[in-house]
């Protein structure tokens, strides 16, 4: 073994395997491009993005970790969303109030 060596497994890796997916259209109504990262709670994304934030509650983009989707001004774009996993708690963005998404206290 060589330090830092990476051993790859066989076959393809499916991201978000088994996750329920939601598809919606997003339009950037602003005058500058907006990028949204892979683990951002989508309803809290830039206010210039026009989409159904209520339907997107508890979801993030269905893209590989560490990547982002760029929304150009005035361009409609269809994206797939997946539910946030883990404890389903969101802190530090603009959710009011911050905390659990599923109503548990």
From Swiss-Prot:
Cellular component annotations (GO), alphabetically ordered: urease complex
Cystine connections: none
Reactions the enzyme catalyzes: urea + 2 H2O + H(+) = hydrogencarbonate + 2 NH4(+)
Pathway note: Nitrogen metabolism; urea degradation; CO(2) and NH(3) from urea (urease route): step 1/1
MF terms in GO: urease activity
Subcellular location: Cytoplasm
Record-level GO BP terms: urea catabolic process
UniProt keyword terms in alphabetical order: Cytoplasm, Hydrolase
EC number(s) reported in the record: 3.5.1.5
Quaternary structure, from the entry: Heterotrimer of UreA (gamma), UreB (beta) and UreC (alpha) subunits. Three heterotrimers associate to form the active enzyme.
UniProt family annotation: Belongs to the urease beta subunit family.
Name the UniProt record assigns to this protein: Urease subunit beta
Lineage: Bacteria, Bacillati, Actinomycetota, Actinomycetes, Mycobacteriales
């Amino acid at each position: 073994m060589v330090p830092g060596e990476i051993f790859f497994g066989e076959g393809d890796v499916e991201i978000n395997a088994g996750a329920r997916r939601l598809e919606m259209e997003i339009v950037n109504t602003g005058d500058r491009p907006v990028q949204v990262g892979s683990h951002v709670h989508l309803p809290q994304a830039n206010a210039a993005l026009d989409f159904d934030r209520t339907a997107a509650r508890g979801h993030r983009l269905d893209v590989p970790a560490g990547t982002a989707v760029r929304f150009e001004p005035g361009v409609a774009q269809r994206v797939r969303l997946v539910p946030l996993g883990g404890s389903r708690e969101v802190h530090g963005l603009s959710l009011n109030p911050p905390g659990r998404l599923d109503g548990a206290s």
